[in-house]
Amino acid sequence: MPLNARIICCCLLPLTVSAWAAESPAVRAAAEDKAQALEQKVADQQSPKTAPQAAPLSKSEAQAVDPAGQAPLDDALTCLSRTLYWEAKGGETEDMEAVADVVLNRLGHEGFPGTVCEVVKQGSQKSPCQFSWWCDGRPDQVEEEQRYSVAKEIARKALNQQLKDRTGGALYFHDRSASPDWARAYIKTVEIGSFLFYRPKDLAAR
């Protein structure tokens, strides 16, 4: 390579890296804003006339959020992705998709909180957690980046409402290895992968 070409490349490289570093937080912030709008659209689905317009999240936008699985749990995409990662840890893709169905079913139900983060953290203050990973006393940071990338892609599709609800409107689920007493009072809607799914007979939140 000619000397002058090498000098040009060396000069351009820091600029390219600097531009990427500057763009990444902007892309992440924009993606989080999109996820919040999509979250609100799901929460307001019982009143479609008032539901906000929301552009879908792209794959690259979703992957820009919480890339290492270490970020605070304070935005819709991170809270949903981390829930799918931990609740379905060791399971198949269908397990993650089904857990996402339950989170969004709750988000769109008047008896549950109005944000994804509030849904997945519900119960941590006064009663047993609705989602066990949130208060099991273990670190919440991701251990497998590739699997977390899959979880984020499923979370993206869920927030975009691109996943068909295969749980039959379930609001609750448990692992096949468990036999919780509460399940006796509910209607089992379906079995998917590692989980059994339920909804209350009167569709009221418990």
In which residue ranges do the predicted regions lie?
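N-terminal signal peptide c-region/cleavage motif recognized by signal peptidases
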Residues: P14-A21
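Bacterial extracytoplasmic/cell-wall-associated proteins, especially those involved in peptidoglycan
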Residues: N4, A22-P25, A54-R206
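Bacterial N-terminal signal peptides that target proteins for export
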Residues: M1-I8
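Charged, low-complexity intrinsically disordered regions
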Residues: A19, Q36-E39, P48
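Hydrophobic helical h-region of N-terminal Sec-dependent signal peptides
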Residues: C9-L13
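Short N-terminal segments immediately surrounding and downstream of signal-peptide cleavage
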Residues: S24-Q40
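N-terminal Sec/ER secretory leader and immediately downstream segment
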Residues: A43-K49, A55
